[in-house]
């Protein structure tokens, strides 16, 4: 004999439809999802709280909207380095690396930055700049603050160009030690600055393999707040760490 299981006068099938409708996700438009009609003939909708929660989740991961104007850089240690990435006028990222941190927290005797990493950053910046129409090279974004740099490599040398605003030739020291190129500058405090303001300081160590460069032939020139450094390369026949292998 056929029988119907009911709870408080309502068929079990109706209760199951209501439970399934309550667990159903909202549609992409944010409107509730209608389920099969209940016994009353009215559609069953998801609870308002569940709909609001799902909508908030979609907003959390939705990055469309007003473009960001500043990008903080987190270094390899996981801390904010103080460096910035500027955005183009239409909000697209323009990756212009900065040679020095804004607060000069770099330890002159700490771990040096490898030359390969600097050149890789420069290549990435050049690609990003070329892909962003309406910009005038690296100078467009970099001119907004000091500490920008340009690095390039040719067959004869590696060339660095570093912005050190407020400093003159007498404020800058460049030397090579223990396979590293050290660039250090410290300017004079501006009398118009606040009492707590520190004078401009710049420090950077770049790792250079001494067996690939002429460390005693490095040249540096400071002019109009821009330091230019040329590190000549050793020719392959001059390198003592390169040994040709005869192929038989």
UniProtKB/Swiss-Prot annotation:
It comes from the Eukaryota. The keyword Nucleotide-binding does not apply. Residues 26-48 are annotated as: Disordered. Residues 139-248 form the sHSP domain. Belongs to the small heat shock protein (HSP20) family. The keyword Plastid does not apply. Induction: By heat shock. GO terms for cellular component: mitochondrion. Residues 1-32 form a transit peptide. Keywords: Mitochondrion, Stress response, Transit peptide. It is found in: Mitochondrion. One of its GO terms (biological process) is response to heat. This is 26.2 kDa heat shock protein, mitochondrial. Its main location: mitochondrion. May form oligomeric structures. InterPro entries: A-crystallin/Hsp20_dom, HSP14.7/HSP23.5/HSP23.6-like, HSP20-like_chaperone.
